[in-house]
A protein has these predicted regions:
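Conserved beta-strand signature within the Rossmann-like core of class I S-adenosyl-L-methionine
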Residues: 152-160
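Conserved Class I S-adenosyl-L-methionine
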Residues: 167-170
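Short helix-loop-beta connector
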Residues: 57-63
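A short glycine-rich, Lys/Arg-flanked "PGG" loop and its adjoining helix->strand segment in the class I
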Residues: 139-151
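Conserved class I S-adenosyl-L-methionine
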Residues: 2-56
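A short acidic, Gly/Pro-enriched loop at the edge of an enzyme's catalytic core
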Residues: 114-126
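Residues lining the SAM
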Residues: 128-132, 158
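Class I SAM-dependent methyltransferase SAM/SAH-binding core
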Residues: 65-115
Length: 170
């Protein structure tokens, strides 16, 4: 990501989880500003995550959850890389509304900081890009991800280094 608009990004890190975060992302969807900002910032999280995911998993038909899918940037990368069976979930309905058609099999709204209404052992893989950061998703969400995954599943996520240290992910 370039430093061009980093000042515009900093308010995200000052938010508290919950309605404040949802409202911020809802506002960010106006005129598709979120996707435009990701391009301007040269955000490579989705591509890098899927590159790592496919390095450790050769099966293209496993059931995957893109947790915190936003506008579908990771889903687009999954599809480009031949994956065929994945769902998307996000906290912001307005972000979900911007996901292109025919990317995900299912889209649903969830709060990753709460127990999610997904059965145990549902998924064989999870991607989670850009959600483990200040004011967003907290460490207990990892326990939920493990719960909804089958044994030996791959969970591939990005994490802001500051939150890794400050919130006790280590």
């Amino acid at each position: 990501m370039s430093q061009k608009d980093i000042g515009n990004k900093i308010p995200i890190y000052k938010l508290k989880a919950g309605k404040e975060v949802e409202d911020y992302y809802d506002e960010w969807t106006v005129q598709n500003k979120y996707d435009k900002d990701m391009v301007d910032w040269k955000y490579s999280g989705p591509q890098e995550t899927i590159d790592l995911f496919k390095k450790h998993n050769s099966k293209k038909d496993i059931k995957i959850l893109d947790a915190g899918c936003g506008t579908g940037l990771v889903g687009i990368e999954l599809k480009k890389n031949g994956f065929t069976n994945f769902d998307g979930a996000d906290f912001s309905q307005k972000m979900l509304n911007l996901v292109p058609e025919n990317i995900y099999q299912n889209l649903f709204k969830i709060d990753l900081n709460q127990k999610v209404k997904i059965k145990d052992n549902t998924y064989e893989g999870i991607t989670c890009v850009g959600t483990f950061t200040f004011g967003h998703v907290n460490p207990p969400a990892l326990d939920e991800m493990v719960r909804i995954c089958k044994n030996a599943s791959l969970i591939c996520f990005t994490i802001n280094i500051g939150i890794y240290e400050e919130y006790g992910f280590d």
